[in-house]
Structures are given as C-alpha cells and as structure tokens.
Amino acid sequence: MVDEIAGPLASAAELAGAAILQDQKLLSIGLGPDCASATVFASLLHQGVLRERPALPVVEIAAHQIESVNVGVGWAGQRIQALGQPGDVGFIFAALLSHADIQRLSQTAEQRQMQLVWFGNRGPGLNINANDEEIETRVALNMTLAICAARLIDIHTFGPMEGSK
C-alpha cells in the first residue's frame, strides 16, 4: 500500500507547493468523520509542522455535524463556489462520499478552474486512497495521510528542516 500512495502523495505536495508559490490557496475539505482530517491538515499548514514559518494560505471547509452527506456536499459545494479561484488546489477527504457526491464537488471545482486531490476515494484529479478497505480504515488512513501531506507540502515549499538529514 505504501508504494501505491507514495507517488500520488509526492505529486500532491508538488501541486500544492506550486499553487502556494503562485499566490494561490489550498482548500481543505472534509465532512462528517473526514472533518477531523481536513481540520488537522489545515491546522498543520497554518501553524507549521515542527518549525516556525509563515502560515500557508489554506481555507478549511469542514463540518462535523451534517444532517446528511447530501446536505453536507451541497454546503461544501457552495463554499467552494464562493471561495475557490482559478489555480487553487482542493484537498478533499472523501471516505464517505458516493460517486454522485464526488461528481457534484468535482463539477463545482471545475467551474472554478481548481485542481483536486482526493483522499479515501476516487475522483477526477490526483487520488490517494485505499478504496478497497473498510470505511473505518479509510477514515483512519485519511488522518495519517493528512499529516503526511502537510509535512511534505511544508518540506516542498520551505525546504528540509535545519539539522535534518
């Protein structure tokens, strides 16, 4: 599984780094159980990972309590429509999303000319997932991937930490 996610995770870090260096922003999107992954990802990018550095431009679009996934996807789509700009990159933690939900979010992002990175499910753009796993495993894996992605974006954007080899 590590080999399957290493390449796409590195590509996601490069995509995010390029967007940041071009004064674009990242959107961290998660609903229900995936909200925690989106929150951790955004927080680590705001505060830095193990070092002081400028906060990165990341917008958190996350809701813990949603009436239904359908309502949550509608709300997230509205936020993407309002906040997304051409060249922005959306990191979507999508373990619970259906194919129809993924299509709705991807269409909204496409209208805003954004690129997407999907965690825990398959969608248009970069995919970092374990789709064959149980939902609980995908949600837990998304949390780990959120931390790894934030760390890789930090290194890609600011270089390795002093004293690290």
Predicted feature locations:
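Glycine-centered short loops/turns at secondary-structure junctions
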Residues: 23-24, 113
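A short, well-structured juxtamembrane/interface segment
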Residues: 1-22
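Structured helix-beta-strand junction loops
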Residues: 22-23, 86
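Glycine-rich phosphate-binding loops that contact phosphosugars or nucleotide phosphates
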Residues: 31-163
